[in-house]
């Protein structure tokens, strides 16, 4: 399967108006949009061009502006790389949506509040392959996709929004996408996060999602969720950097031994579990642990200290996403299981 990931000969790499020669690294910016006062918003790109044939890997983070773990993961993973010993090349966009990043919010909230109807759709992550003459989200998606479609494969790094924490989990495009989806599966296995979701239902495999549209365009890609929104978490940054470097090793781009997790789970479906009552949320299960049907996941306590609900696992699975908010109302998610 690895051989279905395209290899490129070492040639000058054109990013925007900049040429990155083999054996060199560059930090550059691509014009994105212009604000009302004339301020130019630019997309940051790190290009590392090796001197030997190999894949061209796209790495992206922070398409949602509060997903800062991914920004740190990429800088940590790429800092030690020497382009003079790299096979292939890397196109890295550490902040895929600068306006959302400025807002420190999942979406560019000031633009959305100014004109909610004109800004719909607002989530660039769902707008691929994008439209260069569309709204803000569609322009961001089109600009990113212009980089992605020139690459051999892609990894898109996320966290939940504030109030959620994921285990390090690779979420694959639907197996129904054929050989490119198989190659994405192989790439995720090389990254070895310890948790892999292989499903054909739900948000992550919907049309318009970055990794879905990349895979449809024959650029095998997966979504990598890790850690908590709005936080820089040292342990998660280290873990994410390990997975990115594992992928580089598996692709033959750098020479080293992959570092593997103690256990690995391959799951078939997400199951979100929501509160039936409101109150203070006490999570009872350790993130990443396997649970049985009927195991207590969380306790909801009212403002007087009385337990009003004990949330039980409705199915056996793995506790892959925790809610870190201290209060919940009826209908809010308190846990997500990955079903085995």
Question: Residue ranges of each PLM-predicted region?
Answer:
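Structured catalytic-domain cores with a bias toward divalent-metal coordination
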Residues: 1-340
